[in-house]
Amino acid sequence: MKDLLGLMGKAKEMQAKFQAMQDEIATVESVGQAGGGLVSVILSGKFEMKSLKIDPSLFKEDEVEILEDLILAAHNDAKAKVEQIMQEKTKALTSGLPIPPGMKLPF
């Protein structure tokens, strides 16, 4: 019974830590760039786009597809950075816990 109560206490503690981590990640902003900085995107930790900057030299009718590709690449770059931050924080929080590799935690 003592072990069960201890386990339940640890579960509540972990839940509180995960919530704090999620709150912290929500405040993170990540910058993604493409085209050597011609396009940049800022994403929040919740993957909301906060900013999009495009160099005016890209506003040419015959370069629309290039611009579209650069916007997508910048967004994906920022998204990958946010995901990396989330992974690092989750790993630090769960170190020492018997969690199977590759298990996605509730985010």
From Swiss-Prot:
Where found?
Cytoplasm, Nucleoid
Top-rank taxon: Bacteria
What Gene Ontology cellular component terms go with this record?
bacterial nucleoid; cytosol
Q: What is its main location?
A: cytoplasm
Q: Which GO terms describe its molecular function?
A: DNA binding
Q: Which InterPro entries match?
A: YbaB-like_sf, YbaB/EbfC
Q: List the disulfide bonds.
A: none
Question: One of this protein's Pfam families, by short name?
Answer: YbaB_DNA_bd
Provide this UniProt record's keywords sorted from A to Z: Cytoplasm, DNA-binding
Assembly, in brief, is:
Homodimer.
Q: Which family does it belong to?
A: Belongs to the YbaB/EbfC family.
Q: What does this protein do?
A: Binds to DNA and alters its conformation. May be involved in regulation of gene expression, nucleoid organization and DNA protection.
Q: What is this protein called?
A: Nucleoid-associated protein mlr5504
